[in-house]
């Protein structure tokens, strides 16, 4: 119960950082203002003399106070020194903010407690610094730093608050009760010190629960820009260190603390209210007397300077003990900043070699090393490189010997996703990293697990062989390799090594690239158990003149003639004055299936859903799940006791399946409240219908419904398309209409719409499987113009399932293709416009492809063009493959 409350609190604070920070700062400033402008107007040393205070100053307490200050500074120094070992400047910065703001809040409370007397801060601040604990603050920061995105930052902060919040609350309560015992000692100086301690604990707790998590969230949001995709503050090795089980409190310790708290509460109650009910010895009065604030011993004087000058002079004036303290602080600061940074960076480097490599080029002998996948990491390498480094370490480009004979592999395919200028065919790129000596023989599993769980070491202190050993022993799940390694690429590399040993041909993966790819955008979003990426040729067709705009359309395909043919269609459309398009409907669908006790009950639910009241109830529940999802209509059908409900809703610039599914689930829960006997069988009952041929998509539409048209002049038909209008119309009727009807096609009244749709989908990061429904298209042609020699063509596509955010559109190469079309990401001015524009481009490009292919068929050029452009001229017998191998 408490964990849930703290989780909700942490999620709220992390989701609204500006509001929380402004609120806490405003509250603190208001408290400071109340201290300055209200309350007692007697200020010791300015308008009143405090003779007793002078006596206290001359006492031997100065030595003790100076020692206390020095110890406090050393304590803070060692805490920050420990934080530096974690290797993150963000933890240091956030911890510094925590310390500064906590000190500010504490100072405000102390000034209020001392009735505007600043002198008491000299005694109070050392006790505050001694009681401040940066370990919990840094732990919460590490929860946030283990995130891959801003949304995950908020979730991890909430999870951290759920784990740390109850423990910190109980610890703060126990500390206050224990330190508070000193306020009942009767010794005035001890009472004041204990009051300072209690205020220190409360100030720390207040800042930790409000300002600090909001500040962490805001700092990481402002610094979320990344190089090569990974957030610059993301530290993946924290993910395994901060498992919830390791941070959960010991239940025995918690029970002891609770029992202790109850006992201390009884002690305080007995001492304050039963044994001595009189308020004479209150701590506030005692502190005032001890600091010379008693009205009876104070004498009024005339101020010689203004109040702010008085405070400024007291801050500037320094005694010998303050000089000692300040000197120690400055010396430690200089040592920490200038002398320890180099030492720390030489022993620990947590920088991601993908995000910020320092690259040098080293010449190596020809044919000595190959840039290809490896089976054993760093055990086989060039002597020249080994002599240079003398160690085993991770490289930007790993150097190993080929897996097959060098004579069989004279050439190697090289693929780079990123800056290709860093590659040199005659050199090997080596990332300069701190030297980490790894043993040649794998160490025992127990020792490897200890290194893996050490926050200061981690996976980069283990060799690939040791990681594989841990995977085989089931200590590391194979699917978690990317999150546990210091880089995602190394996790992919190790998985390839594991897989290669299980394949009949160990060198099968040598032509499947995996290096220089931003896997941080893939993990948790696009693919699992990654072993590489598939480079697909991307061509461009265009310019496509559509709606008085020109588009260069990217197409990823391995089918020859496709891009060239589409490009010819684009040219014909452009010479004819361009094409026009309209979006007829926009609504993604999800069709769950529910069951009721009887068919008549299903009919009653269907009738209720068709009423305005029922639709309004369901729409309210559905729309509450997203700021983009807006339920448009419901389409219901009955099959016996089963009721199929087709939800149709807009989804902004997202394709929308996940968004609509979430709304559908909430709507079904609301429907269940009205019909408790209803049983939800599946959130998808194939009534959507997704990734399957279905007449309902062809008739009702799904996603974006688009129509596109163009008029091609007779001259362009003859000179560019090399045929006649009459011939194209004849082929279109008998092929696309009659032929498809004879085949019983559903939505397939076209020549090859799926070709263009799939090529654009792959290039632009769409779900390629959705070409099944998205390729529904009817192509119509007819004669037009004054002499009926011009060609009018139209393509109607009622179910284009497409989006510009989410899924594969987050990958950088796919984003580049979307940027070519000017539709990358979400449209801020008109949500959903980018996705609709992309759907119009798809329809227009399909029309261009239809135009060119139909012309080729009418002219009899299809086979001839494919023989020229779609046949490989390479002698396959010269290549080594699964079925055709050269004999020895």
UniProtKB/Swiss-Prot annotation:
Glycosylation sites: 281, 296
Residues the record lists as Phosphoserine modifications: 504, 872
Result, substituting residue 822 to D: In LGMDR28; likely pathogenic; decreased hydroxymethylglutaryl-CoA reductase (NADPH) activity; reduced Vmax for hydroxymethylglutaryl-CoA reductase (NADPH) activity; has very low affinity for pravastatin
Disulfide-bonded cysteines: none
Residues that bind CoA: 565-571, 720-722, 865-866
Result, substituting residue 443 to W: In LGMDR28; likely pathogenic
Stretches that traverse the bilayer: 10-39, 57-78, 90-114, 124-149, 160-187, 192-220, 249-275, 315-339
Name of the featured protein: 3-hydroxy-3-methylglutaryl-coenzyme A reductase
Organism: Homo sapiens
